[in-house]
Curated annotation (Swiss-Prot):
Organism domain of life: Bacteria
Cross-referenced PANTHER family: LARGE RIBOSOMAL SUBUNIT PROTEIN UL2M (PTHR13691:SF5), RIBOSOMAL PROTEIN L2 (PTHR13691)
Pfam family for this entry, one: Ribosomal_L2_C
Sorted UniProt keywords: Ribonucleoprotein, Ribosomal protein, RNA-binding, rRNA-binding
Protein name: Large ribosomal subunit protein uL2
Organism: Pseudomonas fluorescens (strain SBW25)
Length: 274
């Protein structure tokens, strides 16, 4: 991968920083693994805004990514190509299994076209192979981690993400996440070895507001710039600071307020994130 800074030929190009990967497939995606993706504009079935800052953007297809990797145990697969996916920050890899089926997976870092991958208890310890956490050596770096056996990967799926397996005790293993959190996960859950590809994603700069609009993201308006009817920070004569601690448009504390409410899984957290 290469980090490319654009020359300031226009105001919109001045701050553009691109991450260029020459290995990415330049053709169309694999059609049988595409699904229609409808735009909602952030509205529900009543037409009311349920998620702010969503609207517009380029038309996209959803790529069907295999997050489970549990029904092809022992069947080797060849990486046909690495592709761009507009629906996520990570790249995806198209696998051709020995039985003739093709599937997309999250592309692990260091995996390229022509590599052989396999899933299952007997899979060798190398990046891209998927197996149960109880079969992975302590100290290994993993991604695409399940929280419930068979449910599919839920942890460490975005660009550059990973976790480290630091202990194994009984039916649980302990993972250290990138956030600093340490948590227990059932040893029967699956994970993929290595870290997620496209770790340079955070180094890019879109350069202009329009590039954000191409991605379907609308502007975020500050509460202090609104009227009192629209936001608790709105109104006032001239410019104000809002007059109170930061809150959301509905009056809930924001900017640092704890939002985690899943007490059921608190017992699985060994150490809270930093």
């Amino acid at each position: 991968m290469a980090i490319v800074k654009c020359k300031p030929t226009s105001p919109g190009r001045r701050f553009v920083v691109k991450v260029v990967n020459q290995e990415l497939h330049k053709g169309a995606p694999h059609a049988p693994l595409l699904e229609k993706k409808s735009k909602t504009g952030g509205r529900n079935n009543n037409g009311r805004i349920t998620t702010r800052h969503i609207g517009g953007g380029h038309k996209q297809h959803y790529r069907l990514v295999d997050f489970r990797r549990n029904d092809k145990d022992g069947i080797s697969a060849t990486v046909e190509r690495i592709e761009y996916d507009p629906n996520r920050t990570a790249h995806i890899a198209l696998l051709l299994y020995a039985d003739g089926e093709r599937r997309y997976i999250i592309a692990p870092k260091g995996v390229s076209a022509g590599d052989q991958l396999i899933a299952g208890a007997l899979a060798p310890i190398k990046p891209g192979n998927a197996l149960q956490l109880r079969n992975i050596p302590v100290g290994s770096t993993v991604h695409g981690i399940e929280l419930k056996p068979g449910k599919g990967a839920q942890i460490a799926r975005s660009a550059g993400a990973s976790a480290q397996l630091i202990a194994r005790e009984g039916v649980y293993v302990t993972l250290r996440l990138r956030s600093g959190e340490m948590r227990k996960v059932l040893a029967e859950c699956r994970a993929t070895l290595g870290e997620v590809s496209n770790s340079e994603h955070s180094l890019r700069s879109l350069g202009k507001a329009g590039a954000k609009r191409w991605r379907g993201v609308r502007p975020t308006v500050r509460g202090v710039a609104m009227n009192p009817v629209d936001h608790p920070h709105g109104g006032g004569e001239g410019r104000t600071s809002g007059g109170r601690h930061p809150v959301s448009p509905w009056g809930f504390p924001t900017k640092g307020a704890k939002t985690r409410g899943n007490k059921r899984t608190d017992k699985m957290i060994v150490r809270r994130r930093k």
